[in-house]
């Protein structure tokens, strides 16, 4: 298919210069296609699977803590491709390539080839895949398959779960990687060694692999395009995961990881599902660990696993059953990192001097050392050790080699009473890891969420089986049910709580939020990004409910209260105010049937300050100059406390020079003062200069 795409792009280029008719339109369309393909190429290098669920998740989730510097080479190539994508526009400036004949036929051929190019490109494939995965489906048939553990544990053994970052079992292949992982290879002969373990959709990146293995469900965001990590108060509140179950059984759950726990919502997941302690990179900074022990992603694995050993001893001495979970980091794609403990260690390979191979060799030694310490300790007899890859390796310096191998995840279980065996699965995935551990703890337990024990010969239907059959035709039903775990299914009542969050079902969401319901008033989509644009462009057969400050809906609202605009399928509307939202409103309640005005174009807040600033109490004059601004009056306000408290607000009209002056009175010091304007999505404002003037002193400029 790649050669077909290359040929079609070449033909498009020839058709572009063949005729001047609609030349700029053709050049623009070709450049747009090339830009999209360039963006896809960058995403594919990062995800290893084009635009998939992981891509969408990380775009919506908090990206703080990502080691962006590791991908500088990919980004540089992407910038070069962007510049190359603009070449069709430059080409039109070369007059000699333009031929004034056959304009209509040439343009028709150009359109046909453009459609062919899209059809054979990965853009169409990934778009089709995402459509099938995210389209509404009836999940009712799989609801009975979602099972939570209820049976009490008779023997409460301690658990140590070691996730190896991208440390797939494929690296065990002695023909390709001789002697690369001798320690884990030896441990596999002493363990329950699970083979052919795959990663299904919604489990192929770190947080998704953890959710899949510990909850038995694929990770999807809540319905729609919401930034689930930054705006959702709870992480999968309707899911019941391994940590929840073990906590109910009297366990203490302890996590130690080297990366930032806020990245992709990992810390939120753990805190929401039974973990008592979550230590991340900040914990190691607070301990005073020297900078030489950190990479762009966080603390190195030698320091991390030493801390895990210390935690194991401390938890064991306490006498309470526990699950200690740790996640390594130094084998992260694309090139890995080498801690000080392995600086003098090298892996000699016919493949060459590849840094990632050194990192894998080091990780094998460090994990093997931790496991040996635990097993040889006086607490080892009462401990089950799980060694697992969080997911298959993403594109890295060994991608060309791995592409020729049979890829499989790593999953080992070691314990005193666990007889070694190799379990070859026919349709197993990381969704089944937690259920398998539960059977080792309690033989009668074989399910966790949609996961099924891989040791059970009579396991009931599972999501893993559905993902492996008929090209995964029925797997979207499991994804659809997993989405409901973000909000629950009773979502027709809305209210705003004392923290200013919208309560929908079991979830708490920071507004602005647009909720779309189907014609049966079942929650269909949640929008938390570009909400005013979505509201203007969404024409639903059901009901829309938009919750934001009343300023978004009314010119005369200056009290900072919350309002909800509800629009039914007949375009009847009602604006609910703060007292109604405090009590709660039913989105399926009948609305006023009197003639309605056109649906309003709601406003959205636009930040004018570059960052929040600490400001002392006193009276100020806000002065700003806006080079680009709306032609009409608009609201400007000062806010604090994560934009939840409105300190000052004024309806402003810039003068001819774009100057705006507004008094701001602060009764007490504010740690996070920000200035914002309320505009609809078609308007924009560009601030050239902004200052807070206190008496005659000028505050810091932003």
Swiss-Prot record:
Main location: membrane
Pathway assignment: Glycan metabolism; osmoregulated periplasmic glucan (OPG) biosynthesis
Keyword Cell membrane included in the entry's annotation: yes
Enzyme Commission code: 2.7.8.20
Keyword Zinc-finger applies: no
One cellular component (GO) term of this entry: plasma membrane
Gene3D superfamilies, A to Z: Alkaline Phosphatase, subunit A
Compartments in which it is found: Cell inner membrane
GO molecular function, one term: transferase activity
Spans through the membrane: 3-25, 73-95, 102-124
Lipid bilayer topology: Multi-pass membrane protein
A Pfam family: Sulfatase
Keywords from the UniProt entry: Cell inner membrane, Cell membrane, Membrane, Transferase, Transmembrane, Transmembrane helix
GO biological process, one term: glucan biosynthetic process
Catalytic reactions of this protein: a phosphatidylglycerol + a membrane-derived-oligosaccharide D-glucose = a 1,2-diacyl-sn-glycerol + a membrane-derived-oligosaccharide 6-(glycerophospho)-D-glucose
Family, as annotated: Belongs to the OpgB family.
Record function comment: Transfers a phosphoglycerol residue from phosphatidylglycerol to the membrane-bound nascent glucan backbones.
NCBIfam families named in the record: PRK12363.1 (NF009027)
Protein name: Phosphoglycerol transferase I
Organism this protein belongs to: Xanthomonas campestris pv. campestris (strain ATCC 33913 / DSM 3586 / NCPPB 528 / LMG 568 / P 25)
């Amino acid at each position: 298919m790649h050669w077909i795409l290359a040929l079609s792009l070449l033909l498009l280029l020839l058709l572009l210069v063949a005729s001047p008719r609609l030349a700029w339109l053709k050049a623009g369309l070709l450049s747009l296609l090339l830009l999209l393909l360039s963006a896809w190429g960058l995403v594919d290098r990062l995800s290893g699977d084009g635009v998939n669920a992981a891509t969408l998740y990380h775009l919506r989730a908090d990206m703080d803590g990502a080691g962006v510097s590791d991908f500088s080479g990919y980004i540089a190539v992407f910038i070069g491709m962007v510049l190359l994508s603009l070449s069709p526009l430059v080409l039109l400036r070369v007059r000699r390539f333009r031929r004034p004949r056959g304009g209509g036929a040439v343009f028709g051929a150009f359109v046909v080839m453009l459609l062919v190019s899209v059809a054979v490109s990965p853009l169409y494939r990934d778009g089709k895949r995402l459509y099938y995965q995210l389209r509404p489906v009836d999940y009712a048939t799989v609801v009975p398959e979602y099972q939570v553990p209820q049976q009490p544990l008779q023997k409460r053994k301690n658990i140590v779960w070691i996730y190896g970052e991208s440390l797939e079992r494929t690296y065990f292949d002695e023909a390709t990687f001789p002697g690369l992982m001798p320690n884990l290879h030896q441990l596999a002969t002493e363990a329950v060694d699970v083979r052919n373990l795959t990663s299904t959709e919604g489990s192929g990146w770190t947080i998704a692999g953890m959710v899949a293995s510990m909850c038995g469900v694929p990770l999807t965001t809540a319905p729609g395009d919401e930034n689930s990590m930054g705006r959702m108060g709870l992480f999968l509140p309707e899911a019941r995961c391994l940590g929840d179950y073990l906590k109910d059984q009297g366990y203490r759950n302890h996590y130690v990881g080297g990366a930032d726990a806020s990245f992709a919502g990992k810390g939120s997941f753990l805190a929401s599902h039974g973990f008592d302690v979550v230590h991340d990179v900040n914990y190691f900074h607070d301990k005073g660990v020297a900078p030489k022990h950190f990479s762009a992603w966080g603390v190195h694995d030698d320091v991390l696993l030493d801390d895990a050993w210390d935690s194991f001893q401390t938890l064991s001495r306490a006498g309470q059953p526990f699950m200690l979970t740790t996640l390594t980091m130094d084998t992260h794609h694309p090139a890995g990192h080498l801690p000080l403990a392995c600086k003098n260690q090298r892996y000699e390979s016919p493949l060459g001097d590849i840094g990632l191979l050194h990192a894998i060799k080091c990780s094998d030694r460090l994990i093997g050392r931790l496991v040996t310490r635990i097993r040889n300790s006086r607490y080892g007899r009462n401990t089950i050790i799980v060694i697992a890859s969080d997911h298959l390796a993403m594109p890295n310096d060994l991608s060309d080699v791995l592409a020729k191998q049979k890829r499989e995840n790593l999953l080992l279980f070691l314990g005193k009473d666990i007889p070694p065996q190799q379990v070859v699965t026919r349709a197993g995935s990381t969704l089944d890891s937690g259920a398998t551990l539960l059977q080792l703890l309690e033989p009668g337990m074989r399910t966790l969420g949609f996961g099924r024990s891989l040791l059970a010969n009579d396991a009931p239907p599972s999501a893993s089986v559905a993902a492996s059959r008929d090209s995964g035709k029925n797997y979207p039903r499991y994804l659809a049910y997993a989405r409901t775990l973000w909000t629950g299914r009773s979502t027709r009542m809305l209210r705003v709580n004392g923290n200013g969050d919208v309560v929908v079902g079991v979830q708490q969401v920071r507004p602005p939020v647009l909720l779309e319901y189907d014609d049966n008033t079942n929650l269909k989509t949640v929008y938390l990004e570009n909400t005013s644009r979505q509201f203007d462009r969404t024409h639903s057969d059901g009901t829309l409910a938009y919750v934001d400050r009343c300023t978004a809906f009314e010119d005369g609202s200056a009290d900072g209260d919350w309002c909800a605009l509800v629009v039914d399928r007949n375009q009847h509307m009602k604006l609910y105010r703060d007292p109604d939202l405090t009590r709660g409103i039913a989105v399926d309640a009948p609305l006023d049937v009197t003639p309605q005005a056109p649906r309003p174009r709601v406003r959205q807040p636009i930040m004018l300050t570059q960052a929040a600033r600490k400001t002392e109490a006193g009276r100020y004059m806000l002065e700003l100059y806006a080079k680009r601004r709306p032609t009409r009056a608009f609201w400007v306000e000062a806010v604090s406390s994560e934009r939840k408290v409105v300190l000052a607000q004024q309806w402003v009209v810039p003068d001819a020079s774009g100057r705006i002056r507004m008094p701001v009175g602060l009764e007490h010091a504010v740690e996070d003062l920000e200035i914002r304007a309320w505009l609809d999505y078609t308007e924009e404002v560009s601030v050239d200069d902004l200052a807070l003037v206190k008496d005659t002193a000028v505050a810091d400029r932003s």
